[in-house]
Structures are given as structure tokens and as C-alpha cells.
């Protein structure tokens, strides 16, 4: 019996050791999500805004075709991952309330910098993928405009 418990204990201890690694990975994915899609207080919401922020965030090597920035608080965005401001939507969570957003679309041409972008500002509900209560992926294809 003692011999059987040894390997079980080892597996249990390894599992405990891997849990922090998994949480750290989720934090990294959340940080990446924020870098790509979060801008609390945009300075203007036109083409120059898009060209500037896309370059600052490292999204122009190569020029990213489409990227949306969410303007709100981190807590409001995180709340989509629970029932406070989110609801299930396929494999994602859809926000119950609209967010102010800016979508930057590449004007075309070369995918090498300098990248030109068109900005579309608006309010809409958004869909995100969540892991351990944190948003880790923004669904660019989900578009429902608010009334």
C-alpha cells in the first residue's frame, strides 16, 4: 500500500507545482490581450490614432489587417468573463453592455511599415474568450452594433 501511495503523492505534488505555471500563462495571455486590444483613454480616434497606437503596440511588423481597441476600464472588460457583464456566446463570452471601441483597418498595399490605417469609432457589444476569469482573446468577427 505504501508503495502505491508514493507515486500518487509524487503526481499530486507535481500537479500543485504546475498550477502556478498555468496561472502565470493565463496572466501572460491576459497581458498580451491588453497590449493588443485595450486603450482606456484614447487620444483622438482617427487614422492618426490608429497609425500611432498600432506602431506603439508592435502591431505593424507586418501591418496587421484589422485590430480593435476597447475603451473602458480593465474591471469592466474582465467582468465579461463572469455573469456581472457577460453571457455565454458559442465558445466566447459576450458583453451585456456596449463598449466604446475603435477598429483600425489597414488601408491596403504593402504589409510592411509604414502602415496606413482607417479608424472606425463606435459603441458595440463585444465577444472575448476567457481563461480563469481573464479575457485572453478578442473576437474581431463578432459585430453587433448597439441601438
UniProtKB/Swiss-Prot annotation:
Q: Which GO terms describe its molecular function?
A: DNA binding; endonuclease activity; protein homodimerization activity; RNA nuclease activity; tRNA-specific ribonuclease activity
| EC numbers | 3.1.27.-
Q: Just give the chief location class.
A: secreted
InterPro entries found in the cross-reference section: RNaseA, RNaseA-like_dom_sf, RNaseA_AS, RNaseA_domain
The source's domain of life comes to Eukaryota
Position of sequence motif Nucleolar localization signal: 55-59
Q: What is the regulatory mechanism acting on its activity? A: Has weak tRNA ribonuclease activity by itself due to partial autoinhibition by its C-terminus, which folds into a short alpha-helix that partially occludes the substrate-binding site. In absence of stress, the ribonuclease activity is inhibited by RNH1 in the cytoplasm. In response to stress, dissociates from RNH1 in the cytoplasm and associates with cytoplasmic ribosomes with vacant A-sites: ribosomes directly activate the tRNA ribonuclease activity of ANG by refolding the C-terminal alpha-helix. In response to stress, the angiogenic activity of ANG is inhibited by RNH1 in the nucleus.
Q: In the UniProt record, which is one GO cellular component term?
A: nucleus
Q: Where in the cell?
A: Secreted; Nucleus; Nucleus, Nucleolus; Cytoplasm, Stress granule
Q: Which UniProt keywords apply?
A: Angiogenesis, Cytoplasm, Developmental protein, Differentiation, Disulfide bond, DNA-binding, Endonuclease, Hydrolase, Nuclease, Nucleus, Protein synthesis inhibitor, Secreted, Signal, Stress response
Any keyword Cell wall biogenesis/degradation? no
- Cysteine-cysteine disulfides: 50-104, 63-115, 81-130
Task: Provide the function of this protein.
Answer: Secreted ribonuclease that can either promote or restrict cell proliferation of target cells, depending on the context. Endocytosed in target cells via its receptor PLXNB2 and translocates to the cytoplasm or nucleus. Under stress conditions, localizes to the cytoplasm and promotes the assembly of stress granules (SGs): specifically cleaves a subset of tRNAs within anticodon loops to produce tRNA-derived stress-induced fragments (tiRNAs), resulting in translation repression and inhibition of cell proliferation. tiRNas also prevent formation of apoptosome, thereby promoting cell survival.
Report the protein name in the record. Answer: Angiogenin
Q: What is the source species?
A: Sus scrofa (Pig)
Q: Which gene encodes it?
A: ANG
Amino acid at each position: 500500500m505504501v508503495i502505491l501511495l508514493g507515486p500518487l503523492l509524487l503526481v499530486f505534488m507535481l500537479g500543485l507545482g504546475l498550477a502556478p505555471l498555468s496561472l502565470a500563462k493565463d496572466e501572460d495571455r491576459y497581458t498580451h490581450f491588453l497590449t493588443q486590444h485595450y486603450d482606456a483613454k484614447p487620444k483622438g480616434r482617427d487614422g492618426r490614432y490608429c497609425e500611432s497606437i498600432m506602431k506603439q503596440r508592435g502591431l505593424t511588423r507586418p501591418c496587421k489587417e484589422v485590430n480593435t481597441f476597447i475603451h473602458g476600464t480593465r474591471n469592466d472588460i474582465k467582468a465579461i468573463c463572469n455573469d456581472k457583464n457577460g453571457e455565454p456566446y458559442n465558445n466566447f463570452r459576450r458583453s451585456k453592455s456596449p463598449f466604446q471601441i475603435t477598429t483600425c483597418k489597414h488601408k491596403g498595399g504593402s504589409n510592411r511599415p509604414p502602415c496606413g490605417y482607417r479608424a472606425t469609432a463606435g459603441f458595440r457589444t463585444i465577444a472575448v474568450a476567457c481563461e480563469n476569469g481573464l479575457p485572453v482573446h478578442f473576437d474581431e468577427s463578432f459585430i453587433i452594433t448597439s441601438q
